[in-house]
Each structure stands twice: as C-alpha cells, then as structure tokens.
C-alpha cells in the first residue's frame, strides 16, 4: 500500500517484552503486553518522551497548517470572540461587589469591584465600571498565570487567592489587603501589594476563614519531585490553619484521602470533610469554633462516618445547622442538625425530589431559603421558608437553561446569571424582602445582557429530543442548529459527550460551536450527562458508549445528519467515550476529536489522582473489575481486524496533572503503529507548557479551536460558507 498523501507517522521504538500479568475472574492469569510503557515517563525525565512530543508536533503542525481553512477559521474566531463577558457580581464583606470581566480577547479575566451603592453603574456598554482590583494578566508575560480561587475574610480587609501556572492543578495561595488593588500601569511579571503570606503545594482550593479574620483553614500536599509533570500522585493531603500553621488532620493509614474544612457563614461551626474516592461521599466531623482553641487543638465530633453521602453546609441559626445532602435522598435534600440534640440526626427540612436534583442552596434574610434544582438539563429556582421548609414559589419560570446565583444572607437581593446554548448570558437582579415573603417586592429585574455582534442568535434554535439506546432506555439529547437548516439528511453534526461521574451536561453557550453550525450548515446536539449515574459506571460503563453510539445512529436515521457526517468530540472522561466508540464502531463516525482523555484503563490508578477514580471505573487489580475494564479499555481494544479508522485528532497538554498525558501518548502511538498507511490521518497535537483545560489563554483556545474545526471540516469534506458581511450569519451548526 502506498504512503498516504499526508505522509508517514513519526517512528517510535516498541518494547515487545514489556508486559504485566493481571488476575481475571473468568480467565485466571492474563498477561497484557504494553509496548509503549516507555511513554509513561514524563518528558522532563525522558529523552524518548521528549523526542516523541517533538516529532508528533512537527507532524501534526505540518498537516494542520496545510489546511487552507485553518487560517480562515483563526481570523473568524478572533473576530467572533471579541465580545464582552462577565460573571455574576458577588457582594463581599468589604461592602463591594466583585466580578470577572473580559472585553473579548484578554488572556485571563481580571477582577473588578464596585461599592455597593454604585452597583447600577457597572457592566454598561462603555465597559466594566467600578475599579480594577486584580488582573492575573499582569502576573506573567504570556498570560499563563491563572486565578484559580478566592476567599474574602469576614472583616473585609484580607483577600486570599490562588495562582496556578500553565493551567497546572498545583497552585500557590497568597493574601493581599483589599486596600491594595492592582493598577493597570504596573509592570508585568510582578504582583505588588500582596502580603508575605505564601502557601505552596496546594492542589485544590479549599480556603475557609475563621470569623475573627485572623486566619483560615486550607488543604495542601507535600512537595513531590513529579509536581507539574503530569505524574505526581494525589496522596498525603493535610489540613492546616494558616495563622500558626497548626497541623489539624493526618491519617497515615489513608494517604489518598482528601481533606477540607468548611466554616459556616456565621463563623461559629467548622465542618471537617474527608473524601476517599470519586464518589465524593464523605466522612463528616463538626467543631464549635467559639468554644475551641485552635492553638491547643480542635475537638471534632463525628456526625457521619459511613461514607454513604455528601454534605455541604448552608448556614445555621444558633445550634441548628442546615445542610444540603444526599443522605437518604438520592437527589439531595435540605436537612437540619441540632448540635444540642445530636441523637435526632439529620432531620428533613425540604425532602428530596424524585425527578430533580438539588444543586445549590442559599439562605437570605431572616427566613428565606433559595434552592436551585436541575430538572432534565435545565435549572429551576424555588423560594422556601427556612422555618417550615414550605415552598413559597418558583422564580424565573420562563427561563429554561443554566442559572448561577450569588448573594449573602445579610443581603436583600441576589444576582442570577442565565445562559443556554444560544444565549451568552442575561444577568437578573432578584429583590428579596428581608423579613417576609412579599410577592410585590420579591421580584426579578433585568440588569444586564451579554451581546454577541458576530452572530444573530435569533437565527438559531435548540431542540430537546429523547432517543432509545441499545437496551431501550430513553436518553435525552439537545440539538442546536440554524433555523433554516432542515432535517433532509445532508447536514454534518458535531456530537459532544462526557458520560461520567454523574456530571450532567448543562446548556452551555459557546460562540465557537455556533460558528461551526453557522459556517458548515450543520447540526449540533449534546449528550445529556448521566441522569442514571450508576447505570453508566463500573461494570455498566459500556452503557455510556452504547448511549453515545445510539445517539449518532438516531441522528442519521432521523435525517439530522448525513451518513458519515457525524463528528464526535469528548475530553477527559469523555475521551474514554470517543476512543472506545471509535474502536467499537469506526465506520459510524466521520471524525473523532479527543481532548486529554483516559485510554489505558489498566494503568490509570498509578498516576495523578487516578487511584481516587476506582469508585467510577473499578480497580484493574481486582479480578472481577479487570474483566469488564479490559473489555473496553481503549488502548487495549484497538481493532485487530482490517477496518478503516475515521480521521482522528488528539489534543493533549504536556503538563496535564489531572489526566496524565501518557494515556494519549501511548494510545496514539499504538494507533499509528496499527494503521500506518490507513486512508485517514491520526494526528496528535500537544500544547506545550499547559495543563488540564483550565488556565489556557484566550489566544491559545482560539488557535486550538481553529485546528479542531478546520480538521473536522476537511475530514467531513465540508466547504466554508462565509458571507461578504461581518455577521457570518446562517451558515453552520454545532453540537454543544
């Protein structure tokens, strides 16, 4: 067979002797060969891995840059991303509202603030308003410093914040006085005004201040020589109190457990939460900070130690503490715990729903409880009486998308930011009577709207469909497309899915996805997370792949997509799905995009936080689990028969310490070896000096998206349709 027109893949030496023996319940001892195990060694410790990255990038860049549509995509995305966007304003204890604002192409979004009395002046057509408080773009020369978490002290004088570099999970916590904001004219690469407090080796932002503002609880990990290279293990998490570095929690028998502390909004109670796996079920302990001495040691009382549920503290009224929990309520409930009567346990205040998941709960005023539910894939907000739990009414009944709320109990208002697949964001201001329920004064007002000039969003529509999976189960899917694209079986479709950890796919606005719909005259849809999480985990993981495959088949059968015109896209856990599906039905998909996925499911527990994921995927060293994991593990199930694999683009960051890059490296090497002269390309694009999704600058995201969409267009044989005007309207559709 001649060499394909796009050239030969970079060579890499296989080790045919590398193997591990596993125990199978069905087959006894099973020897599994791993010829690319050398790629498990990070690039900063291995010349082989370093050379592999270099050669793969040379190869992929040559292919991607040869596509004339790539540059057109790049320029189109730059123009289209140039629209202002912001987050929900949050009132803090220094009597300011804080919010993120980006005018379009800034690498990272700066933090702005405004005095409470001047909140009406912010987010106008002329700009953010208020004053610049903190700009992460000033911390580095190339926009790689990311603000990953913040926590204001109760007194309003101190602001704790975490900075990560290159999108890495590892972060450093700093503290600055709120009286020391950034200035736009300051020198880049520095952070003047911060205090001497520096806390390194943090991996997840768990910061909770005590009510005296003298310090805060935080979680950290010990230094590790693999920190930042994608292979550092997530073990030995410990809880500290910053002011005097008092060591609060250690469990040498369980080094893989995570610990964090939540302080109640009143500041009286601290909740110590232990997490041991990806189920996020917790060990829960409580302490009264008003009667404890942090210096001499906190006395913790165990509230729950059976690892059967998750808890988050909502607030408290004296000794009565309110929790959001899924204890004895699969979809979560609001429960109350009386510290003075612990024998009563967690009593139900608002029972769990049968068809809606309680996502968030906040207290307002004297007796108001605001609850945010997920119903199907949209959010619903209800107002309850905290004393009786009685539902008073639903607010924002005409909205059917994603809603984020902010506010404090002391406030008489909250902000609600709404978005969906075709709405970039509408900010509402909900007024709440502090003392009673009043239908005349408790009302929502339109505050601000995010506008996109590059597209006429009224030209798009989102449909909601149910389709049967392999076993007959009805699965939900969203489909977004231009109104003038019809179901005649000629359109391309881009499918996105995640399918794991009980994470639902909420309607999420993406200008890039709408541009795909608008330019390629296509159709887009979204796999609806896992409403039935247990039916898609462990030994039932195959159900997720069956659901995704059934969606593609349904779209073709019902003429939403043309045969061979379905492109699939997934990242992280979704990367298991795209690679497993392309192994199992390569003929069904016209193109496959995989972003930072897991592929070697027999080795995933050995790297980064992999050991915590056993509750989701199973333990390959357990004979029963081995049998079902080995059956679908993408790296071990590349087709042996003569098949034509679809065009495949793998996107990976070299310093990803959430999902180790070794998965992608090994899988791509194996695919290229198995199909060296196939008619379709198997391409690996490695983003250097970056981590798992978060922290990428706006321009890096635009460049990556241009590579993705031009690759899809070429793979599906699509022609770009750009009108002569600047609105790019009515041309493509994407699956969101």
UniProtKB/Swiss-Prot annotation:
GO terms for biological process: proteolysis. GO terms for cellular component: cytosol. InterPro entries: AB_hydrolase_fold, Pept_S9_AS, Pept_S9A_N, Peptidase_S9_cat, Peptidase_S9A, Prolyl_oligopep/macrocyclase. Keywords: Hydrolase, Protease, Serine protease, Virulence. It comes from the Eukaryota. It catalyses: Hydrolysis of Pro-|-Xaa >> Ala-|-Xaa in oligopeptides. Monomer. Belongs to the peptidase S9A family. This is Prolyl oligopeptidase dbiP. It comes from Dendrothele bispora (strain CBS 962.96).
């Amino acid at each position: 067979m001649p060499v394909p027109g796009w050239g030969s893949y970079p060579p890499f030496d296989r080790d045919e002797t590398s193997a591990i023996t596993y125990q199978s319940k069905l087959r006894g001892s099973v020897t599994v060969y791993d010829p690319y195990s050398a790629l498990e060694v990070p690039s900063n410790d291995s010349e082989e891995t370093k050379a592999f990255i270099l050669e793969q990038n040379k190869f992929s860049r040559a292919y991607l840059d040869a596509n004339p549509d790539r540059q057109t995509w790049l320029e189109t995305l730059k123009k289209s991303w140039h629209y202002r966007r912001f987050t929900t304003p949050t009132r803090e204890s220094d009597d300011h509202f804080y919010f993120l604002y980006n005018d379009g192409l800034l690498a990272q979004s700066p933090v702005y603030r405004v005095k409470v009395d001047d909140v009406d002046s912010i987010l106008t057509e002329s700009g953010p308003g208020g004053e610049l408080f903190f700009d992460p773009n000033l911390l580095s020369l190339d926009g790689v410093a990311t603000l990953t978490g913040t926590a204001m002290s109760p007194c309003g004088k101190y602001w704790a914040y975490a900075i990560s570099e290159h999108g890495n999970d590892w972060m450093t916590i700093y503290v600055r006085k709120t009286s020391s904001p950034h200035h736009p004219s300051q020198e880049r690469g520095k952070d003047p005004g911060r205090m001497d407090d520096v806390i390194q080796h943090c991996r997840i932002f768990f910061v909770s201040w005590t009510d005296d503002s003298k310090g805060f609880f935080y979680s950290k990990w010990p230094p590790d020589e693999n920190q930042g290279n994608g292979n550092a293990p997530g073990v030995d998490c410990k809880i500290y109190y910053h002011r005097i570095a008092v060591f609060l929690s250690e469990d040498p028998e369980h080094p893989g457990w995570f610990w964090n502390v939540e302080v109640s909004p009143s500041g009286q109670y601290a909740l110590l939460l232990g997490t041991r796996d990806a189920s996020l079920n917790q060990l829960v302990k409580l302490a009264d900070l008003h009667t404890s001495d942090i210096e001499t040691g906190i006395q913790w009382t165990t509230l729950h130690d059976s690892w059967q549920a998750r808890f988050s503290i909502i607030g408290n009224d004296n000794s009565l503490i309110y929790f959001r929990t899924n204890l004895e309520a699969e979809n979560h409930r609001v429960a109350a715990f009386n510290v003075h009567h612990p024998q009563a346990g967690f009593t139900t205040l608002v029972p769990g729903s049968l068809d809606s998941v309680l996502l968030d709960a906040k207290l307002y005023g004297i007796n108001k409880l605001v609850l945010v539910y997920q119903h199907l894939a949209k959010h619903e907000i209800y107002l309850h009486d905290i004393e009786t739990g009685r539902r008073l009414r639903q607010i924002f009944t005409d909205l059917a998308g994603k809603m984020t709320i902010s506010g404090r109990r002391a406030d008489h208002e909250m902000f609600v930011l709404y978005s969906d697949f075709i709405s970039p964001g509408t900010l509402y201001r909900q007024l709440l009577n502090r003392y009673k329920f009043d239908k005349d004064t408790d009302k929502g007002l339109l505050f601000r709207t995010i506008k996109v000039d590059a597209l006429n969003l009224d030209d798009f529509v989102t449909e909601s469909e149910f389709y049967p999976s392999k076993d007959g189960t009805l699965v939900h899917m969203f489909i977004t497309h231009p109104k003038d694209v019809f179901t005649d079986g000629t359109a391309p479709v881009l499918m996105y899915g995640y399918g794991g950890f009980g994470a639902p796919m909420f309607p999420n606005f993406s200008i890039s996805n709408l541009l795909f719909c608008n330019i390629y005259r296509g159709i887009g849809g979204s796999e609806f997370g896992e409403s039935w999480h247990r039916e898609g985990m462990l030994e039932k993981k195959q159900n997720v792949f069956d659901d995704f495959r059934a969606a593609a088949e349904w779209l073709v059968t019902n003429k939403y997509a043309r045969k061979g015109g379905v492109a699939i896209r997934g990242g992280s856990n979704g990367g298991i799905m795209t690679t497993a599906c392309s192994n199992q039905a390569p003929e069904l998909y016209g193109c496959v995009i995989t972003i930072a996925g897991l592929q070697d499911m027999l080795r995933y527990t050995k790297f980064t936080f992999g050991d915590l994921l056993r509750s989701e995927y199973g333990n390959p060293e357990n004979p029963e689990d081995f049998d079902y994991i080995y059956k679908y593990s993408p790296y071990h199930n590349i087709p042996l028969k003569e098949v034509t694999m679809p065009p495949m683009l793998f996107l990976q960051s070299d310093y990803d310490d959430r999902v180790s890059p070794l998965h992608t490296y090994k899988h791509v090497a194996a695919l290229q070896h198995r199909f060296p002269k196939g008619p379709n390309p198997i391409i690996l694009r490695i983003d250097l000096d970056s981590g798992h999704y978060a922290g990428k600058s706006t321009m890096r995201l635009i460049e990556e998206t241009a590579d993705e969409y031009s690759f899809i267009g070429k793979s599906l044989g699509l022609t770009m349709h750009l009108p002569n005007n600047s609105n790019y309207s009515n041309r493509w559709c994407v699956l969101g």
